[in-house]
Amino acid sequence: MFSETHSDSQRADRILASIRREEARPGRGLLKIFFGMAPGVGKTCAMLEAAIQAADKGVRVIIGVAESHGREDTMRLIGRLPRLPMKKMVYRGVEMEEFDLEEALRVKPQLILVDELAHTNVPGMRHRKRYQDVEDLLAAGIDVYTTLNVQHLESRSDTVHDITAAPVQETVPDSVLAEADCIQLVDITPDQLRTRLREGKVYSAPQASAALDHFFKESNLTALRELALRIVAEKVDHELTEVRTISGDRSIWRSGERLMVAVGPSPFSARLVRWTRRMAYALNAPWIALSVDTGVPLPPE
């Protein structure tokens, strides 16, 4: 009885939350997050390319802030869109530049690009965090494109620290990701990212060399990539569950994914089974473990 009541309550909460979001939608901007496992995967370029496509279709686009980090490809894309002047601030005797929220609200484009969602603003700005600036833009009816790395997601920062041993100073609440209208995963393989580092396309040579041996070790990147993929899969699954609940017809929303893991005498079999089970849970998919017996005795070693 308890489980049934609890399930009904959860279903009601989901429907109510959806209704509230729909009621709040008129006049509110849309948020799209370009999400990746680490710096250098191409989030800013993907955001700029999507914005250029929107501008070509007649959307009034402006860059609020886009960080090139000296990367030529990024700078070329930035040059193809109008850009809002940065706001100059003096902090502890040093002149710094920040996103000018007030000017963005005055200009009020249809779409604005605000890079590095987890950024902490200089003291004296309207908000302490950039994601709070984004909230004001959305409330004003402006669509926003932004970027985020997995290590900056609040609930995963400890996990990332355990993986990389690198402290995470800036985080974004999970609610920001949960309420985003669209998340685009920007994904490359760990080997491709390490190649970009060696070619100087992410950091300068001395910094890149140190990064390859620490944060950007292949094992770290593989774990971060799995984490990013899992987060996006979980969000898609939650959205699908919500739609199925509201529709009242679960049968037409079956995604069809099934997972199979092949196991054998390898010492890694247990780890493979655990990984498959986690992925099946994230995808809400059935899974099986398969072992093939060829009838041939295994060698002594």
PLM regions with names:
Residues R250-E301:
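Small/aliphatic-rich secondary-structure junction motif
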Residues R60, K108-L111, A140-T146:
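Loop/turn-to-beta-strand initiation segments
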Residues A208-F216, N220-M260, P297-E301:
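Long, charged amphipathic helices and adjacent flexible linkers at domain junctions
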Residues T146-A210, H214-K217:
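Internal gly/pro-rich beta-alpha loop/helix module
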Residues E116-Y131, S155-D158:
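Conserved ATPase-coupling elements of RecA-like P-loop NTPase cores
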Residues K129-N149:
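Substrate-engagement module of ASCE P-loop NTPases
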Residues R28-D100, R106:
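Conserved P-loop
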Residues M1-F34, L229:
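Extreme N-terminal, non-catalytic leader segments
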